[in-house]
Amino acid sequence: MNRFYKLTALSLLISAAAASQSLAFDPVAEAAKHIASMGVGKKDWPQWGGSPSRNNTVQDADIPIEWDVKSGQNVVWSAPLGSETYGNPVVANGKVFVGTNNGNGYVSRFPNTKDLGALVCFDEKDGKFLWQHSNEKLPTGRVHDWPDQGVCAAPVVDGDRLWYITNRGEVVCLDTEGFHDGQNDGPFNTEAYENLDEADVVWSFNMMSQLGVSQHNMCSCSLTYVGDLLFVSTGNGVDEGHITLPKSEAPSFVCMNRQTGEVLWTDNSPGANVLHGQWSSPAYGTLGGVNQVIFGGGDGWLYSFLAEGENGKAKMLWKFDCNPKGSFYALNRATRNHIIATPVIYDGLVYVGVGEDPEHGEGGGHLWCIDPTKRGDVSPTQVFHVDDPKTPIAHRRLQAMIEKDGELERDNPNSAAVWHHVGNDPEEFEQTMHRTCGTVAIKDDLLFVADFSGLLHCIDAKTGQGYWTYDMFAASWASPLIVGNKIYIGDEDGDIGIFEVSKEFNLIAEINMGSAVYTTPVVANDTLFIANRNRLFAIRQGAQSEGIE
Protein backbone atom coordinates (compact mmCIF):
# COMPACT_ATOMS: atom_id res chain seq x y z
CA MET A 1 0.00 0.00 0.00
CA ASN A 2 1.21 3.48 -0.82
CA ARG A 3 1.70 5.40 2.43
CA PHE A 4 1.87 8.83 0.77
CA TYR A 5 -1.14 10.47 -0.84
CA LYS A 6 -1.02 13.70 -2.82
CA LEU A 7 -4.24 15.66 -2.62
CA THR A 8 -5.47 17.76 -5.49
CA ALA A 9 -9.09 18.61 -4.75
CA LEU A 10 -10.02 21.64 -2.69
CA SER A 11 -11.56 21.44 0.76
CA LEU A 12 -14.77 23.32 1.34
CA LEU A 13 -13.80 26.99 1.31
CA ILE A 14 -16.49 28.78 3.24
CA SER A 15 -15.11 32.28 3.30
CA ALA A 16 -11.94 33.91 2.10
CA ALA A 17 -12.58 37.22 3.83
CA ALA A 18 -10.15 36.57 6.66
CA ALA A 19 -7.94 34.12 4.83
CA SER A 20 -5.19 36.48 3.79
CA GLN A 21 -3.38 38.75 6.17
CA SER A 22 0.38 39.23 6.17
CA LEU A 23 2.41 36.92 3.96
CA ALA A 24 5.38 37.76 6.16
CA PHE A 25 3.83 36.46 9.38
CA ASP A 26 6.50 34.65 11.40
CA PRO A 27 5.18 32.39 14.20
CA VAL A 28 8.72 31.60 15.32
CA ALA A 29 9.51 35.27 15.94
CA GLU A 30 6.16 35.73 17.69
CA ALA A 31 6.85 32.84 20.09
CA ALA A 32 10.45 33.98 20.65
CA LYS A 33 9.24 37.47 21.53
CA HIS A 34 6.81 36.08 24.09
CA ILE A 35 9.38 33.72 25.61
CA ALA A 36 11.85 36.62 25.89
CA SER A 37 9.27 38.49 28.00
CA MET A 38 9.13 35.64 30.53
CA GLY A 39 11.54 34.78 33.31
CA VAL A 40 13.14 31.96 31.32
CA GLY A 41 15.98 31.49 28.85
CA LYS A 42 15.42 32.90 25.38
CA LYS A 43 15.66 29.43 23.80
CA ASP A 44 13.68 27.62 26.50
CA TRP A 45 10.28 26.02 25.86
CA PRO A 46 8.38 27.02 29.02
CA GLN A 47 4.88 25.72 28.26
CA TRP A 48 2.86 23.49 25.96
CA GLY A 49 3.15 25.05 22.51
CA GLY A 50 5.92 27.38 23.67
CA SER A 51 3.68 30.44 23.97
CA PRO A 52 -0.02 31.15 24.59
CA SER A 53 -0.70 30.99 20.83
CA ARG A 54 0.18 27.26 21.18
CA ASN A 55 1.86 26.92 17.77
CA ASN A 56 4.50 24.22 18.28
CA THR A 57 7.01 25.91 15.97
CA VAL A 58 10.52 26.75 17.18
CA GLN A 59 13.63 28.56 16.06
CA ASP A 60 15.80 26.76 13.54
CA ALA A 61 18.43 24.59 15.19
CA ASP A 62 20.88 21.89 14.19
CA ILE A 63 18.61 19.10 15.38
CA PRO A 64 19.62 15.61 14.24
CA ILE A 65 17.67 13.71 11.61
CA GLU A 66 19.24 10.49 12.80
CA TRP A 67 19.91 9.06 16.24
CA ASP A 68 19.84 5.66 17.90
CA VAL A 69 18.50 5.14 21.41
CA LYS A 70 20.13 1.69 21.67
CA SER A 71 23.67 2.79 20.84
CA GLY A 72 23.30 6.31 22.25
CA GLN A 73 24.28 7.99 18.97
CA ASN A 74 23.32 11.70 19.14
CA VAL A 75 21.72 11.11 22.56
CA VAL A 76 22.99 13.40 25.33
CA TRP A 77 21.21 11.51 28.09
CA SER A 78 18.09 9.56 28.87
CA ALA A 79 16.21 9.19 32.14
CA PRO A 80 13.59 6.64 33.19
CA LEU A 81 10.01 7.82 33.64
CA GLY A 82 6.98 5.97 34.95
CA SER A 83 5.34 3.07 33.14
CA GLU A 84 2.97 5.41 31.23
CA THR A 85 3.77 8.94 30.06
CA TYR A 86 1.30 11.34 28.46
CA GLY A 87 2.59 14.71 29.67
CA ASN A 88 4.48 16.85 27.15
CA PRO A 89 7.93 17.98 28.32
CA VAL A 90 8.60 21.59 29.26
CA VAL A 91 12.12 23.05 29.48
CA ALA A 92 12.96 26.19 31.46
CA ASN A 93 15.88 27.63 33.41
CA GLY A 94 18.05 24.54 33.25
CA LYS A 95 15.31 22.06 34.16
CA VAL A 96 13.05 19.65 32.31
CA PHE A 97 9.57 18.90 33.66
CA VAL A 98 7.35 16.03 32.51
CA GLY A 99 4.14 14.44 33.76
CA THR A 100 4.09 10.66 34.20
CA ASN A 101 3.18 8.06 36.83
CA ASN A 102 5.20 6.62 39.71
CA GLY A 103 6.46 3.55 37.86
CA ASN A 104 10.09 4.48 38.47
CA GLY A 105 9.67 5.22 42.20
CA TYR A 106 11.87 8.32 42.38
CA VAL A 107 10.55 9.49 45.77
CA SER A 108 11.86 7.57 48.76
CA ARG A 109 8.56 7.39 50.64
CA PHE A 110 6.66 5.74 47.76
CA PRO A 111 7.57 2.36 46.24
CA ASN A 112 7.22 2.13 42.48
CA THR A 113 4.21 -0.15 42.97
CA LYS A 114 2.28 2.81 44.43
CA ASP A 115 0.14 4.38 41.70
CA LEU A 116 0.57 8.15 41.72
CA GLY A 117 0.31 11.13 39.45
CA ALA A 118 3.85 12.49 39.20
CA LEU A 119 5.38 15.67 37.86
CA VAL A 120 9.11 14.94 37.63
CA CYS A 121 11.91 17.51 37.43
CA PHE A 122 15.29 16.72 35.84
CA ASP A 123 18.49 18.68 35.34
CA GLU A 124 18.55 19.79 31.70
CA LYS A 125 22.27 19.25 31.20
CA ASP A 126 22.64 15.66 32.40
CA GLY A 127 19.16 14.25 33.15
CA LYS A 128 19.81 13.97 36.88
CA PHE A 129 16.60 13.58 38.89
CA LEU A 130 15.94 16.62 41.10
CA TRP A 131 12.46 16.31 42.60
CA GLN A 132 8.96 14.96 42.09
CA HIS A 133 5.51 16.32 42.93
CA SER A 134 3.57 13.23 43.99
CA ASN A 135 -0.23 13.00 43.96
CA GLU A 136 -2.07 9.99 45.33
CA LYS A 137 -4.94 8.64 43.26
CA LEU A 138 -8.49 9.76 44.04
CA PRO A 139 -10.44 7.17 46.06
CA THR A 140 -13.36 7.37 43.62
CA GLY A 141 -11.28 5.50 41.05
CA ARG A 142 -11.34 5.52 37.28
CA VAL A 143 -14.37 7.78 36.82
CA HIS A 144 -12.25 10.66 38.15
CA ASP A 145 -8.66 9.40 38.07
CA TRP A 146 -7.86 6.64 35.58
CA PRO A 147 -5.32 4.08 36.88
CA ASP A 148 -1.68 4.38 35.79
CA GLN A 149 -2.24 7.46 33.61
CA GLY A 150 -0.22 9.69 35.87
CA VAL A 151 -0.16 13.41 35.12
CA CYS A 152 -1.34 14.12 31.58
CA ALA A 153 -0.88 17.91 31.60
CA ALA A 154 2.18 20.03 30.87
CA PRO A 155 3.17 22.82 33.28
CA VAL A 156 3.89 26.45 32.50
CA VAL A 157 7.03 28.01 34.02
CA ASP A 158 7.98 31.61 34.75
CA GLY A 159 11.09 32.39 36.79
CA ASP A 160 11.21 30.05 39.78
CA ARG A 161 7.48 29.31 39.68
CA LEU A 162 5.59 26.53 37.92
CA TRP A 163 1.84 25.98 37.54
CA TYR A 164 0.05 22.80 36.51
CA ILE A 165 -3.03 20.64 37.13
CA THR A 166 -2.61 17.39 39.02
CA ASN A 167 -4.46 14.13 38.40
CA ARG A 168 -6.62 15.11 41.40
CA GLY A 169 -7.97 18.25 39.73
CA GLU A 170 -5.80 20.59 41.79
CA VAL A 171 -4.25 23.70 40.28
CA VAL A 172 -0.91 24.04 42.03
CA CYS A 173 1.94 26.52 42.04
CA LEU A 174 5.35 25.00 42.77
CA ASP A 175 8.81 26.37 43.45
CA THR A 176 10.93 25.09 40.55
CA GLU A 177 13.91 24.81 42.92
CA GLY A 178 12.03 22.39 45.15
CA PHE A 179 13.76 22.21 48.52
CA HIS A 180 17.20 22.40 46.93
CA ASP A 181 17.29 26.12 47.78
CA GLY A 182 16.90 25.37 51.50
CA GLN A 183 13.59 27.24 51.71
CA ASN A 184 9.93 26.27 52.06
CA ASP A 185 8.15 28.85 49.95
CA GLY A 186 4.58 29.76 50.86
CA PRO A 187 1.90 30.72 51.65
CA PHE A 188 1.51 26.94 51.70
CA ASN A 189 4.35 25.79 53.93
CA THR A 190 2.93 22.82 55.80
CA GLU A 191 4.33 20.07 53.57
CA ALA A 192 4.71 16.87 55.56
CA TYR A 193 8.01 16.13 53.81
CA GLU A 194 10.82 18.51 52.88
CA ASN A 195 13.34 16.04 51.52
CA LEU A 196 15.31 17.04 48.44
CA ASP A 197 13.32 14.59 46.31
CA GLU A 198 10.03 16.29 47.24
CA ALA A 199 8.26 19.27 45.63
CA ASP A 200 7.84 22.64 47.34
CA VAL A 201 4.19 23.73 47.03
CA VAL A 202 3.57 27.48 47.00
CA TRP A 203 -0.23 27.31 46.75
CA SER A 204 -2.88 24.78 45.80
CA PHE A 205 -6.51 25.05 44.68
CA ASN A 206 -8.76 21.97 44.57
CA MET A 207 -11.32 22.41 41.79
CA MET A 208 -13.33 19.36 42.84
CA SER A 209 -13.90 20.48 46.41
CA GLN A 210 -13.82 24.26 45.92
CA LEU A 211 -15.69 24.59 42.61
CA GLY A 212 -17.78 21.41 42.68
CA VAL A 213 -16.12 20.01 39.55
CA SER A 214 -16.50 16.32 38.69
CA GLN A 215 -13.68 15.63 36.26
CA HIS A 216 -14.10 12.63 33.99
CA ASN A 217 -11.17 10.16 34.00
CA MET A 218 -8.54 12.90 34.28
CA CYS A 219 -7.98 16.63 34.18
CA SER A 220 -5.40 17.13 31.44
CA CYS A 221 -5.45 20.88 30.79
CA SER A 222 -2.05 22.44 30.12
CA LEU A 223 -2.28 25.90 31.64
CA THR A 224 -1.28 29.19 30.07
CA TYR A 225 -1.16 32.73 31.40
CA VAL A 226 -0.84 36.37 30.47
CA GLY A 227 0.21 38.89 33.10
CA ASP A 228 -1.21 37.53 36.34
CA LEU A 229 -4.16 35.81 34.62
CA LEU A 230 -3.93 32.01 34.67
CA PHE A 231 -6.37 30.15 32.39
CA VAL A 232 -7.76 26.73 33.30
CA SER A 233 -10.10 24.16 31.78
CA THR A 234 -11.58 22.21 34.68
CA GLY A 235 -12.25 18.82 33.05
CA ASN A 236 -15.87 18.72 34.28
CA GLY A 237 -17.57 15.73 32.66
CA VAL A 238 -20.00 12.84 32.75
CA ASP A 239 -20.48 10.15 35.38
CA GLU A 240 -19.17 6.59 35.18
CA GLY A 241 -22.21 5.52 33.17
CA HIS A 242 -21.44 8.21 30.56
CA ILE A 243 -25.09 9.31 30.64
CA THR A 244 -25.42 12.38 32.84
CA LEU A 245 -23.28 15.15 34.25
CA PRO A 246 -23.33 14.91 38.04
CA LYS A 247 -22.12 18.53 38.30
CA SER A 248 -23.60 20.28 35.27
CA GLU A 249 -23.62 23.59 37.14
CA ALA A 250 -19.87 23.46 37.84
CA PRO A 251 -17.60 25.68 35.75
CA SER A 252 -15.80 24.42 32.67
CA PHE A 253 -13.50 27.42 32.29
CA VAL A 254 -11.69 29.41 34.97
CA CYS A 255 -9.45 32.44 35.21
CA MET A 256 -7.26 32.68 38.32
CA ASN A 257 -4.64 34.99 39.75
CA ARG A 258 -1.45 33.01 39.20
CA GLN A 259 0.31 34.67 42.14
CA THR A 260 -2.32 33.82 44.74
CA GLY A 261 -4.67 31.17 43.32
CA GLU A 262 -7.67 33.50 43.68
CA VAL A 263 -10.50 32.75 41.25
CA LEU A 264 -11.23 35.84 39.15
CA TRP A 265 -14.01 34.54 36.92
CA THR A 266 -15.63 31.27 35.87
CA ASP A 267 -17.92 30.08 33.09
CA ASN A 268 -20.00 26.94 32.62
CA SER A 269 -21.32 27.53 29.10
CA PRO A 270 -21.02 23.85 28.07
CA GLY A 271 -23.18 23.05 31.11
CA ALA A 272 -25.21 19.86 30.77
CA ASN A 273 -24.25 19.57 27.08
CA VAL A 274 -20.80 18.11 27.78
CA LEU A 275 -20.63 14.89 25.79
CA HIS A 276 -17.93 13.02 27.69
CA GLY A 277 -14.95 14.81 29.26
CA GLN A 278 -13.18 18.13 28.77
CA TRP A 279 -9.51 17.58 27.95
CA SER A 280 -8.55 20.56 25.82
CA SER A 281 -6.21 23.39 26.85
CA PRO A 282 -6.73 27.14 26.36
CA ALA A 283 -4.95 29.49 23.98
CA TYR A 284 -4.56 33.25 24.32
CA GLY A 285 -3.98 36.09 21.89
CA THR A 286 -4.81 39.69 21.12
CA LEU A 287 -7.16 39.32 18.17
CA GLY A 288 -8.84 42.23 16.46
CA GLY A 289 -7.39 44.41 19.20
CA VAL A 290 -9.13 42.40 21.95
CA ASN A 291 -7.44 40.13 24.53
CA GLN A 292 -9.08 36.75 23.95
CA VAL A 293 -8.72 33.44 25.77
CA ILE A 294 -10.06 30.55 23.73
CA PHE A 295 -11.28 27.25 25.19
CA GLY A 296 -12.30 24.00 23.53
CA GLY A 297 -15.48 22.73 25.16
CA GLY A 298 -16.59 19.21 25.91
CA ASP A 299 -19.79 19.96 24.00
CA GLY A 300 -17.87 20.35 20.73
CA TRP A 301 -18.03 24.15 20.74
CA LEU A 302 -15.09 26.54 20.74
CA TYR A 303 -15.51 29.51 23.10
CA SER A 304 -13.75 32.87 23.30
CA PHE A 305 -13.82 35.15 26.34
CA LEU A 306 -12.47 38.56 27.18
CA ALA A 307 -9.33 37.49 29.01
CA GLU A 308 -9.65 39.88 31.93
CA GLY A 309 -13.39 39.31 32.31
CA GLU A 310 -15.81 42.10 33.17
CA ASN A 311 -16.75 43.14 36.71
CA GLY A 312 -15.55 39.83 38.12
CA LYS A 313 -17.53 37.73 35.66
CA ALA A 314 -16.81 35.96 32.41
CA LYS A 315 -17.60 37.88 29.24
CA MET A 316 -18.10 35.62 26.25
CA LEU A 317 -17.09 37.12 22.92
CA TRP A 318 -18.06 34.34 20.53
CA LYS A 319 -18.84 30.64 20.29
CA PHE A 320 -18.51 28.24 17.37
CA ASP A 321 -20.05 24.78 16.93
CA CYS A 322 -17.30 22.58 15.46
CA ASN A 323 -19.69 19.78 14.43
CA PRO A 324 -22.37 19.45 11.74
CA LYS A 325 -25.80 20.13 13.21
CA GLY A 326 -27.13 16.74 12.16
CA SER A 327 -24.33 14.82 13.87
CA PHE A 328 -25.21 12.82 16.99
CA TYR A 329 -23.44 11.54 20.08
CA ALA A 330 -23.62 7.93 21.24
CA LEU A 331 -20.99 5.76 22.87
CA ASN A 332 -18.67 4.10 20.34
CA ARG A 333 -20.71 5.18 17.31
CA ALA A 334 -20.90 8.95 17.54
CA THR A 335 -20.58 11.36 14.64
CA ARG A 336 -20.58 14.34 16.98
CA ASN A 337 -17.22 14.97 18.66
CA HIS A 338 -15.82 17.18 21.36
CA ILE A 339 -12.51 19.04 21.36
CA ILE A 340 -9.36 17.47 22.79
CA ALA A 341 -6.86 19.42 20.70
CA THR A 342 -5.62 22.83 21.80
CA PRO A 343 -6.75 25.75 19.62
CA VAL A 344 -3.87 27.45 17.81
CA ILE A 345 -3.63 31.12 16.88
CA TYR A 346 -1.75 31.95 13.68
CA ASP A 347 -1.73 35.26 11.81
CA GLY A 348 -4.94 36.45 13.45
CA LEU A 349 -6.92 33.26 12.82
CA VAL A 350 -7.85 30.32 15.06
CA TYR A 351 -7.42 26.65 14.12
CA VAL A 352 -8.83 23.55 15.82
CA GLY A 353 -9.87 19.97 15.09
CA VAL A 354 -12.41 17.75 16.84
CA GLY A 355 -11.85 14.34 18.40
CA GLU A 356 -12.83 11.80 21.02
CA ASP A 357 -11.29 9.73 23.79
CA PRO A 358 -9.13 7.18 21.92
CA GLU A 359 -10.72 4.46 24.05
CA HIS A 360 -13.91 5.13 22.07
CA GLY A 361 -12.35 4.41 18.71
CA GLU A 362 -11.72 6.13 15.42
CA GLY A 363 -14.17 8.22 13.43
CA GLY A 364 -14.64 11.09 11.03
CA GLY A 365 -13.24 14.47 12.02
CA HIS A 366 -13.46 18.15 11.19
CA LEU A 367 -10.71 20.75 11.04
CA TRP A 368 -11.65 24.43 11.17
CA CYS A 369 -10.15 27.83 10.53
CA ILE A 370 -12.09 30.58 12.32
CA ASP A 371 -12.14 34.38 12.17
CA PRO A 372 -12.06 35.51 15.84
CA THR A 373 -13.17 39.09 15.22
CA LYS A 374 -16.91 38.33 15.01
CA ARG A 375 -19.22 38.16 18.02
CA GLY A 376 -22.02 35.97 19.30
CA ASP A 377 -22.91 32.61 17.79
CA VAL A 378 -20.52 32.44 14.84
CA SER A 379 -21.21 28.81 13.87
CA PRO A 380 -21.51 28.00 10.15
CA THR A 381 -25.23 27.24 10.42
CA GLN A 382 -28.13 27.55 12.84
CA VAL A 383 -31.10 25.26 13.47
CA PHE A 384 -34.76 26.26 13.12
CA HIS A 385 -38.14 24.54 13.19
CA VAL A 386 -40.34 24.71 10.11
CA ASP A 387 -43.14 26.17 12.25
CA ASP A 388 -40.92 28.99 13.54
CA PRO A 389 -38.30 29.74 10.87
CA LYS A 390 -37.09 32.94 12.56
CA THR A 391 -36.14 31.66 16.02
CA PRO A 392 -32.96 29.57 16.31
CA ILE A 393 -33.34 26.41 18.39
CA ALA A 394 -31.06 26.22 21.41
CA HIS A 395 -28.30 23.62 21.19
CA ARG A 396 -29.02 20.14 22.55
CA ARG A 397 -26.44 17.77 23.96
CA LEU A 398 -26.81 14.66 21.82
CA GLN A 399 -28.04 16.10 18.53
CA ALA A 400 -28.55 19.73 17.55
CA MET A 401 -30.86 19.09 14.59
CA ILE A 402 -33.43 16.29 14.22
CA GLU A 403 -34.85 16.44 10.72
CA LYS A 404 -37.69 13.99 11.33
CA ASP A 405 -39.05 16.42 13.94
CA GLY A 406 -39.34 19.19 11.38
CA GLU A 407 -36.01 20.84 12.11
CA LEU A 408 -33.74 22.32 9.48
CA GLU A 409 -30.51 24.28 9.29
CA ARG A 410 -29.68 27.50 7.51
CA ASP A 411 -26.44 29.28 6.78
CA ASN A 412 -25.53 31.65 9.59
CA PRO A 413 -25.00 35.18 8.20
CA ASN A 414 -22.75 35.80 11.21
CA SER A 415 -20.56 32.75 10.54
CA ALA A 416 -16.86 33.09 11.36
CA ALA A 417 -15.86 29.96 9.42
CA VAL A 418 -12.99 30.68 7.05
CA TRP A 419 -12.64 27.09 5.89
CA HIS A 420 -13.66 23.58 6.90
CA HIS A 421 -11.53 20.54 6.07
CA VAL A 422 -12.93 17.01 6.19
CA GLY A 423 -10.42 15.64 3.70
CA ASN A 424 -10.35 15.78 -0.05
CA ASP A 425 -12.35 12.58 -0.46
CA PRO A 426 -14.09 11.38 2.72
CA GLU A 427 -14.94 8.12 0.94
CA GLU A 428 -11.23 7.25 0.88
CA PHE A 429 -9.54 6.50 4.22
CA GLU A 430 -6.23 8.06 3.19
CA GLN A 431 -7.89 11.28 2.06
CA THR A 432 -10.12 11.75 5.11
CA MET A 433 -9.65 14.00 8.12
CA HIS A 434 -10.28 11.68 11.06
CA ARG A 435 -10.78 12.40 14.73
CA THR A 436 -7.73 14.00 16.27
CA CYS A 437 -6.22 14.44 19.70
CA GLY A 438 -3.49 16.48 18.06
CA THR A 439 -2.93 20.20 17.87
CA VAL A 440 -1.96 21.79 14.57
CA ALA A 441 1.45 23.34 13.89
CA ILE A 442 1.74 26.04 11.22
CA LYS A 443 4.63 27.69 9.42
CA ASP A 444 4.92 29.41 6.03
CA ASP A 445 1.14 29.09 5.72
CA LEU A 446 1.43 25.30 5.78
CA LEU A 447 -0.56 23.51 8.47
CA PHE A 448 0.38 20.07 9.75
CA VAL A 449 -1.79 17.88 11.95
CA ALA A 450 -1.89 14.18 12.79
CA ASP A 451 -5.20 12.41 13.26
CA PHE A 452 -5.84 9.50 15.61
CA SER A 453 -6.15 7.11 12.67
CA GLY A 454 -2.46 7.69 11.94
CA LEU A 455 -2.52 10.13 9.02
CA LEU A 456 -0.28 13.18 8.95
CA HIS A 457 -1.95 15.94 6.93
CA CYS A 458 -0.36 18.89 5.12
CA ILE A 459 -2.93 21.63 4.45
CA ASP A 460 -2.87 25.21 3.20
CA ALA A 461 -3.49 27.29 6.33
CA LYS A 462 -5.17 30.08 4.37
CA THR A 463 -7.49 28.10 2.12
CA GLY A 464 -7.91 24.64 3.66
CA GLN A 465 -6.63 22.93 0.52
CA GLY A 466 -5.06 19.58 1.29
CA TYR A 467 -1.66 18.97 -0.25
CA TRP A 468 -0.71 15.51 1.00
CA THR A 469 -1.23 12.90 3.68
CA TYR A 470 1.09 10.22 5.01
CA ASP A 471 -0.09 7.01 6.65
CA MET A 472 2.03 6.23 9.70
CA PHE A 473 0.32 2.82 10.07
CA ALA A 474 -0.05 3.50 13.80
CA ALA A 475 -2.34 5.66 15.89
CA SER A 476 -1.06 9.12 16.73
CA TRP A 477 -1.99 10.88 19.96
CA ALA A 478 0.63 13.56 19.48
CA SER A 479 1.08 16.88 17.72
CA PRO A 480 3.72 17.92 15.19
CA LEU A 481 6.80 19.93 16.08
CA ILE A 482 8.23 22.24 13.40
CA VAL A 483 11.96 23.02 13.62
CA GLY A 484 13.25 25.16 10.78
CA ASN A 485 12.13 23.34 7.64
CA LYS A 486 11.49 19.99 9.32
CA ILE A 487 8.52 18.37 11.05
CA TYR A 488 8.86 15.81 13.86
CA ILE A 489 5.87 13.66 14.89
CA GLY A 490 5.54 10.52 17.04
CA ASP A 491 3.16 7.56 16.93
CA GLU A 492 1.99 4.62 19.02
CA ASP A 493 4.54 2.27 17.41
CA GLY A 494 7.28 4.47 18.84
CA ASP A 495 8.35 5.92 15.50
CA ILE A 496 9.36 9.55 15.08
CA GLY A 497 8.65 10.62 11.51
CA ILE A 498 10.70 13.51 10.14
CA PHE A 499 9.31 15.39 7.14
CA GLU A 500 10.12 18.49 5.13
CA VAL A 501 7.97 21.58 5.65
CA SER A 502 6.72 21.71 2.09
CA LYS A 503 3.56 21.34 0.04
CA GLU A 504 5.52 18.63 -1.79
CA PHE A 505 5.80 15.42 0.21
CA ASN A 506 9.27 14.48 1.46
CA LEU A 507 9.83 11.91 4.19
CA ILE A 508 13.33 12.49 5.57
CA ALA A 509 13.58 9.71 8.15
CA GLU A 510 11.74 7.46 10.58
CA ILE A 511 13.44 6.59 13.86
CA ASN A 512 12.11 4.22 16.49
CA MET A 513 12.24 5.28 20.15
CA GLY A 514 11.88 1.76 21.59
CA SER A 515 8.39 2.33 23.00
CA ALA A 516 5.16 4.13 22.14
CA VAL A 517 5.33 7.92 21.85
CA TYR A 518 2.13 9.56 23.11
CA THR A 519 3.75 12.97 23.67
CA THR A 520 4.92 15.75 21.40
CA PRO A 521 8.65 16.37 20.85
CA VAL A 522 9.99 19.76 21.94
CA VAL A 523 13.18 21.66 21.20
CA ALA A 524 14.97 23.91 23.69
CA ASN A 525 18.53 25.22 23.62
CA ASP A 526 19.39 23.29 20.44
CA THR A 527 18.33 19.99 22.02
CA LEU A 528 15.41 17.76 21.05
CA PHE A 529 13.48 16.27 23.99
CA ILE A 530 11.25 13.24 23.42
CA ALA A 531 9.34 11.26 26.04
CA ASN A 532 8.30 7.79 25.01
CA ARG A 533 6.06 5.63 27.16
CA ASN A 534 8.63 5.20 29.92
CA ARG A 535 11.77 7.22 29.19
CA LEU A 536 12.84 10.81 28.49
CA PHE A 537 15.55 11.45 25.88
CA ALA A 538 17.69 14.53 25.24
CA ILE A 539 18.97 14.41 21.65
CA ARG A 540 21.66 16.67 20.18
CA GLN A 541 23.92 16.61 17.16
CA GLY A 542 27.28 14.98 17.93
CA ALA A 543 26.35 13.67 21.38
CA GLN A 544 27.09 10.16 22.56
CA SER A 545 25.67 8.34 25.58
CA GLU A 546 25.70 4.76 26.78
CA GLY A 547 22.40 3.92 25.14
CA ILE A 548 19.72 1.57 26.41
CA GLU A 549 18.71 -2.01 25.79
Language model features with spans:
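Noncatalytic, solvent-exposed loop/strand surfaces
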Residues: 21-549
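Intrinsically disordered or highly flexible coil/loop and linker segments, enriched in small
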Residues: 2-3, 17, 359
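Bacterial N-terminal signal peptides
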Residues: 8-17
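Bacterial N-terminal signal peptides that target proteins for export
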Residues: 1-9
